[in-house]
């Protein structure tokens, strides 16, 4: 089969690799129908994730069709169309029993495209299938569903749920990339008074408005002052960081009200300063997290009922064999306007 293979930092190739096979009775083999690219994949290609070694097939998000299932698999069978989650779960360890699948200690967690071969290929082996793939109704489009493999559960669980968004809240989302936009969309489910989006790209602020943000502001145009003006100087109830750089995290801590919450969604590669001398007396709560995907079944139901606008985040489409071109477009989002790119297998 063909797959995108990490060769060394800065270099990948779309080339022939052996087809995957069943290695454990809990496995399924999925023929990939649609796949997307994540910002984490770009970090891997740059060499920022040392656990990913040369020869690894990349990718951790897909929709496809089960072609083979191990003897212990109970929830799907060959021919079923499924969502492949970014998180795999053994279902037996302490963390899985608490539905904290991202922390699985039984061989799961974030493994696809990380410690085992991933989804940016014609076929993928998915371990622990009963908790790692989800049957899809025929009414759900593959390009819409694939965004529920990672960014929507991440935005909802790590941003909205950790942030405790409630009716009447003022919510600020710093970073209007795919994760931030998904956080805006899922925040709207809780009827906040307003959602404020902060970004440097005007096109992304336009997208934020289309997804329900009542106010937008460029990051270089005093967003802290806008938040203060809209909240009588108090600050926001919930501030979400969806960029992953120290400066934006520190900005978030300056925009939250006393007793408010800062929910960090962004993936950070450098230390950020934590001004506890200012925050402790304000009773500010700060949360972090890796997605567990425990919300995926609920989000899939909402998608099937037309309540989740995932299609609005897809800006570019490619065929699976155009993987390297898709990476180029996605990596130059400031020039190309890319939010999410979706690649389809030839029909």
For each predicted feature, which ranges?
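Short Gly/Pro-enriched turn/cap motifs at secondary-structure boundaries
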Residues: 7, 19-20, 53-59, 111-117, ...
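Residue-level recognition of short, solvent-exposed, well-ordered loop/turn junctions
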Residues: 23-24, 77, 166, 257, ...
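NAD(P)H dinucleotide-binding glycine-rich loop of Rossmann-like/cofactor-binding domains
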Residues: 92-174, 311
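Glycine-rich cofactor phosphate-binding loops and adjacent beta1-alpha1 units
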Residues: 162-166, 206-285, 346
């Amino acid at each position: 089969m063909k797959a995108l293979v990490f060769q060394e930092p800065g270099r990948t190739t779309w080339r022939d690799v052996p087809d995957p096979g069943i290695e454990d009775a809990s496995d399924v083999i999925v023929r990939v129908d649609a796949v997307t690219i994540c910002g984490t994949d770009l970090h891997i290609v740059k060499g920022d994730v040392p656990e990913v070694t040369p020869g690894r097939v990349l990718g951790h998000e897909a929709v496809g069709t089960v072609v083979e299932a191990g003897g212990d698999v109970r929830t799907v069978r060959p021919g079923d169309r499924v969502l492949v989650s970014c998180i795999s779960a053994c279902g037996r360890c302490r963390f899985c029993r608490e539905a904290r699948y991202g922390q699985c200690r039984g061989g799961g967690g974030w493994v696809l495209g990380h410690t085992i071969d991933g989804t940016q290929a014609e076929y993928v082996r998915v371990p622990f299938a009963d908790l790692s793939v989800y049957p899809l109704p025929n009414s759900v489009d593959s390009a819409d569903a694939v965004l529920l493999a990672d960014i929507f559960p991440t935005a909802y669980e790590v941003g909205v749920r950790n942030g405790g968004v409630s009716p009447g809240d003022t919510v600020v989302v710093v970073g209007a990339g795919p994760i931030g936009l998904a956080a805006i969309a899922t925040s709207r489910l809780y009827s906040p008074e307003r959602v404020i989006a902060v970004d440097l790209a005007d096109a992304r602020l336009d997208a934020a408005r289309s997804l329900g943000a009542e106010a937008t502001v460029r990051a270089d145009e005093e967003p802290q002052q806008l938040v203060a003006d809209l909240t009588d100087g108090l600050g926001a109830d919930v501030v979400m960081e969806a960029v992953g750089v120290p400066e934006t995290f520190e900005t978030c801590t300056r925009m939250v009200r006393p007793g408010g919450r800062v929910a960090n969604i962004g993936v950070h590669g450098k230390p950020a300063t934590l001004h506890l001398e200012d925050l402790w007396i304000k009773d500010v709560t700060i949360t972090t997290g890796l997605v567990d995907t425990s919300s995926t079944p609920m989000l899939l139901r909402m998608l099937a009922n037309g309540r989740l606008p995932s299609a609005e985040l897809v800006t570019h489409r490619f065929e699976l064999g155009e993987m390297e071109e898709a990476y180029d477009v996605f990596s130059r989002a400031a020039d190309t306007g890319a939010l999410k790119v979706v690649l389809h297998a030839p029909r």
